Amino acid sequence: MNKKSYLRRVRLPRTPADWLEAVMNFIFFLCGMLAVCCVVLISVYMVVSGVPAIHKIGLFKFLFGTKWASTAAEPLFGILPFILSSVYGTLGATILGVPIGLLTAVFLSKAADPKLRTVVVTAIELLSGIPSVVFGLLGMQVLVPAVAKAFGKASGACLLSAIVVLSIMILPSIVSVSVTALNAVPPEYEQGSLALGATDTETWFKISIPAAKSGIAAGVVLGIGRAIGEAMAVMMVAGNSPNMPDSLFRSVTLLTTAIAKEMSYAGGLQRQALFSIALVLFAFIMLINVVLNVVLKGGNRDE
């Protein structure tokens, strides 16, 4: 390609409007690169800070050890209880929150009166804006005593309380994304089903929800990401003991709460181990994002 043909393809700015366009494009490029740089820097920092402790402790002992005693004379750094507590807590919140969120989304999208829909949508939006510490405070003052009284336990600060709080916190993500997905279903699908004699309920569950499955799945994955990354609210209701989660009523520590609980006074290998926990948590979040992208791409191919 000679110089003249290149200049014809890439027009140099000549007018003030051209210069403004070039400047704005450069600003857009910088903003995009800033986001990329943030992700890269965080990833590098997590790896650099987290790998040394794993190297000293041993990968198998770190990931599959069942004892965490970071301040003992002979410290132990097994995070399997934290991993399982996070997995069980997230799974329980998903099992509890997804049906409620999905049914709420179907109601808002298909059945609700416009005035009632406005009220419910406003409430859900407010729910999404409530700080985590408020959820934790309400859980600590209301839910924890209720669990202890209902099940005859000395303390209600346990895995079950964490699951209930997390299930409430993930509702806005599931509901909002699912409503958008259900509203995007072509009305011809539902009209055809109704014309064949199906009831409204049959149409919603056999036509609308399957047609919106990729969007609903995206909402569920976003809710899972919110649940596994939550720290403050969970720390206030879970009990924060490094136990294996062999019961819903066990006091447990999650990956996030382990970091939040000990980082303020940690030093030496203990501090490095907390960064290693953060690296494991970061890997979980990255995996969830990959799953979300796969789900969205799969939905686009189906469409």
Feature-to-residue mapping (PLM):
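Generic hydrophobic transmembrane alpha-helix motif, especially the helices
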Residues: 125-170
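Amphipathic cytosolic juxtamembrane alpha-helices at the membrane-cytosol interface
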Residues: 21, 100, 113-118, 186-187, ...
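Transmembrane alpha-helical segments of polytopic membrane transport and secretion proteins
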Residues: 1-31, 292-303
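Transmembrane alpha-helices
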Residues: 177-178, 200-236
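Interhelical loop and adjacent transmembrane-helix boundary motif
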Residues: 234-282
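C-terminal transmembrane helix and the adjacent membrane-cytosol boundary/short C-terminal tail
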Residues: 179-183, 187, 194, 261-303
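Cytoplasmic-entry segments and transmembrane alpha-helices of multi-pass inner-membrane transporters
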Residues: 100-139, 303
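Transmembrane alpha-helix signature in integral membrane proteins
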Residues: 79-107
